Amino acid sequence: MSSTVLSVEPDALPRSGEDAAAIAEDARLRDDIRLLGRILGDTVRDQEGEDVFDAVERIRQTSIRFHRDNDQPARDELVELFDGLSTPATLRIVRAFSYFSHLANLAEDQNNIRQMRLQNGARPGSLVATLAHARAVGISAKELRHFFETALVSPVLTAHPTEVRRKSTMDREMEIARLLDRRERLQMTPEEIEQHEELLRRAVLTLWQTNMLRRTKLTVLDEVANGLSFYDYAFLHEVPRLHGVLEDKLNDDDGAGEELASFLRMGSWIGGDRDGNPFVTAEVMRGTLRLQSRRALRHYLDELHALGSELSIAAHLADISDELRALAENSPDTSPHRAGEPYRLAVSAIYARLAATAHRLGIDDIRAPVAESAPYAEPAELKADLDVLHRSLVANNSAVIARGRLRSLRRAVDCFGFHLASLDMRQNSAVHERTMAELIDKAMPGKSYMAMNEEARIALLAAELRSPRPLASPFVKYSEETVDELAVFRAAAEAHATFGPAAIPQCIISMTKGVSDLLEVVVLLKEVGLVDPAGRSAINVVPLFETIEDLQAAAGIMDRLLGLHDYRRLVDSRGGVQEVMLGYSDSNKDGGFVTSGWELYKAEIELLKIFEHHGVRMRLFHGRGGSVGRGGGPSYDAILAQPAGAVNGQIRITEQGEIITSKYSNPEVGRNNLEVLAAATLEASLLQPRLGAPCVGYLKAMDEISALAFKAYRGLVYETEGFEDYFWSSTVITEIATLNIGSRPASRKKTHKIEDLRAIPWVFSWAQCRLMLPGWYGFGSAVEAWVKAHPEQGMAYLQELNREWPFFRTLLSNMDMVLSKSSIAIASRYAELVADEKLRAAIFGRIKREWHSSIAALLAIMGHQRLLQGNPRLERSIRHRFPYLDPLNHVQVELLKQHRDHAVDEQALRGIQITINGISAGLRNSG
């Protein structure tokens, strides 16, 4: 039997009619898949024996038949195959299919890199294409530079637990990815090819012998360390490089030779997000900031060390500036070998001061200084010294040297400072409310804050904001919760003093319900000196609107807030910018995919009107997940689908879980994704507004479709008797909680109510059983009902919406992708886990009808014959995955039966956890 376990089935080949380029592209991808599949197959045979290898192949072939034909004989054969396996053998098979998923992803990533190189930057979403578009409509390089002076593009990494792989596994996979890329780039002799394959075999074997699952639960600082690894992989080098590329392109256009303002800033929630995570404390936040600073300073010191080696310029061979000479004279380096090398001496002076800075910040385990020196007080001082080197080189005919490592380092210091990434503080409004209530009740006996209505609270909090006296007293005993909250705010004030105001520039309030939720935080910030009674604030107070009801109330809340004189002074002190965060996850769980997307869009339109009325600049922060059910999908399309004027040069957007890994674990892919964010922000700000707002008819139609979809979704999820039992029985929601993939609990409360479940495990569970219900449910019946109610417009009108309206087109495109990954045949096997046959038949039958209805409606509107017809590359990619993805689902179902039939079955549970890992990898954006 062939050892190519990970083979490509006929239905995964290019379809007839696809062009020669697509066929050639697919052939290269299949070659890589075959190579990795052959190596993994050999590894499985060598390590586990011929019987396990043969079982893997039989399961794969039978699973393909089931997927293709959905026939009962194939299902029965699968059950028989699993019944004949011992649990240890099943675990080996599960690991094999899971690693097939991981390796196929690497082959696909390499194929994407290959296509990026072939396109050479001229692709939709690239800076090349966007700048060409800008030139075509008459926007000059000077105007673009001016735009970037106030622009902000900020990817914000979060620790939301959707990445199920261990870092050790990811490290091994990155090694394999590098080997694949080397094979692609280099012309090899037959002997070198053989040696290269040996390296691949070694890496795959090491991967096979590495624990796939974490043995212990992650701590918050573990999550911080994992997040920081992506700075080494991509951000520290690629953020400066992106600025340099854009700077050069603008200067090529007009020859101005001007430097571009830094606009790309990294953000993070890891170590600052306390909403529902009791393990994020003041001390953890301090530790997070130290770890971040350590990563930034280590990078700068390493780059200075390399720069000192490179700048071997002799004083008698090249002139230098007076300021460079003065900097060199301050060097502690007394070696006679460098006496005539002023740039090296200047670099050593900078190095000594930076090492002293690290010591001042409590970071002593990186490169030591060559001598004592005065630390830098702030990053601007370090940047000023680096600028001295730059100016001297440019003034003395060495600009080409200045454009190398020195330019990258100068830009890095400008973008990352001493803090690396801006850490957001986030907490639930209910916690702030309880904290404020205790402070007020103990400071003002006789008052009961919790008994006050909203207007009374606003009046009291506004008065407290103006008062110079603090509310908290060191002589009063407070509850543990209040003590902890005050400690976190004090830690934020310390961070500003130590690392600068960019270290913690935002305080986000989850579940914002009213104006008082924001004023409570403002008063707490005043307690620690980050807000003063004179109307100055050192931090942005950011409401997060998450549920459908909250999104509908958002504009009214912001109108009232911005109309308060005391609060408006704080906004003005922050440059007249107010940030608003929109939550995609909870709004989806609350109202379904269609209504969530529509209410978010409408909220932006209404907020724009309010902010324009008050003369305040709005910055939106999009809390998107990886899956479409949590606001995921291509970033470029998502940004361009925003209402005209909503981006306006500034955007923050969350990146989380498996999406961080897929976007930023490879430098080239990372650079491309950062470029997409920058290009989309530019295009949405300067080019999209020219298209104008959608017509009133489009908005009315979407309002009606949303209401119908909302009714269908709520009717199933919240109003169907027994739905909670069905959900908990037919998905892996219980078993997901056993994975050590994050520090945060899976539920807000220990109940089985859907309302209390966090959005991530909700979406993750539906992805595992291949229904992806949060990404489409309600759409089909809504379209059917709308078309029936509007026969004069009918389907043709919805087809017009798809052609003419980016929002609607993006909504459908994301649904197209989700449905293509779903499988009603696979989902039917999970329905078997529901013991109550009547409940199973009723609910699964309803879901199945809506699934077929949604696909039919989607295809009719898009004018397609099959899912992903308009995206053949993604279609082929998903078809490639089914041969090794589907078997994992079948094994998972059998293991769930086994595990749930026995009180304790640790091996079965471990097998389930491995299938969760593999299915997540195969889907690529499951949470």
Curated annotation (Swiss-Prot):
InterPro entries in the cross-refs: PEP_COase, PEP_COase_bac/pln-type, PEP_COase_Lys_AS, PEPCASE_His_AS, Pyrv/PenolPyrv_kinase-like_dom
Keyword set includes Zinc: no
Catalytic reaction list: oxaloacetate + phosphate = phosphoenolpyruvate + hydrogencarbonate
Family under the similarity heading: Belongs to the PEPCase type 1 family.
GO molecular function, one term: magnesium ion binding
Named cofactor requirement(s): Mg(2+)
GO cellular component, one term: cytosol
Enzyme kind, highest EC tier: lyase
Keyword Transmembrane assigned: no
NCBIfam families attached to this UniProt entry: PRK00009.1
Organism: Rhodopseudomonas palustris (strain BisA53)
Protein name (record): Phosphoenolpyruvate carboxylase
Record: active site: H160, K589
Function summary: Forms oxaloacetate, a four-carbon dicarboxylic acid source for the tricarboxylic acid cycle.
